Amino acid sequence: QRNLPQEPEQTEERRLTVERNVPLDSLFMAYHMCSHDHPDYYAFDILSDLLSNGRSSRLNQHLVQQKQLFSSIDAYISGSVDAGLFHISGKPSAGVSLEQAEAAVREELERLQQEPVDEQELEKVKNKFESTQIFGNINYLNVATNLAWFELLGRAEDMEKEVDRYRAVTAGQLQRVAQSAFRQENGVILYYKKQVS
């Protein structure tokens, strides 16, 4: 068991704009979330899949295909024994400002806070996760890596319960974690801009 001090709770939004010699502007957003051993971890993981895993995911469908505000966008979580982050990163389409891009992402996050996820949409994400887990366990390296991870957490016997934990996530839980995490004061925003010469 590690005994490291926890980062103090963030009480106001953090923002940074950086200009570099890069080909395209990029938007990076991050929100503090729980550690892997917290029950809400599974809800955050499902939220990230709901937002960006596959062509029918919300961010891809709404912001890339329909509104064409982004050329690419991704949502993912990072977290282990310590508290993690919910990340959203994307490259706005030509002519779209980083401010417009951020506003569009915030709109999608607010939707998650205000409206429960449709049961059919939630079931689809859970099924995709379950099939990934099952097919992943065909590979011995994946099984060994997962077993090592759960042993690090001190609960190797729980590895077999992982799918059940994802299956147990409800639309109400998704809405609750979205409301708690996607608050402005809990966010870190980075505008990574193309340097104008």
Task: For every predicted segment, state its role.
Residues 1-38, 49-99, 120-128, 142, ...:
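Non-catalytic beta-strand/loop surface segments
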Residues 41:
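Double-stranded RNA-binding/processing signature
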Residues 67, 106-116:
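A common structural junction motif
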Residues 76-81, 108, 135-165:
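Scaffold signal of the M16-like zinc-metallopeptidase fold and its non-catalytic homologs
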Residues 89-90, 113, 158-162:
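Short beta-alpha connecting loops at secondary-structure transitions
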